Amino acid sequence: MALYTPEYQPTGEEIAVINTSKGPIRVQLAGNDAPIHVGNFVELAQKGFYDGLKFHRYVPGFVIQGGCPNTREATPEQVAAGRAPGMAPFGTGNPGYSIKEEFTTNPNNSHEDGALAMARSMDPNSAGSQFYLCLGPQHNLDS
């Protein structure tokens, strides 16, 4: 999959507001520490890519994950079950590209409680649209 470089240049002042059925989540985006990831996240949000997507993974004390386009048409019951008949598996969708990793190039990028990070596979350059929020410090994910 081709690596995408966002056009959006973060100012370091970006705040994401994720509206959920439980209320809004506000997150300060670290545009100075992860400009590619923040630029990509902002562009996807501005295009409406995240509209209607559901959080598809919740592991108490670890993470809550969203941003998979495969959840767009899923019902809450299907998301809770972790699957929907006839639909691509949750957690496998992407925007059609991936972005370059930034976690090894900046020591400020750490998984503190409440941190927002991009989900990826074992390939460090495989992040696209999926993200997770840390539910407690997750320093085992820092490398």
What does each model-found stretch correspond to?
Residues 1-143:
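Cyclophilin-like peptidyl-prolyl cis-trans isomerases
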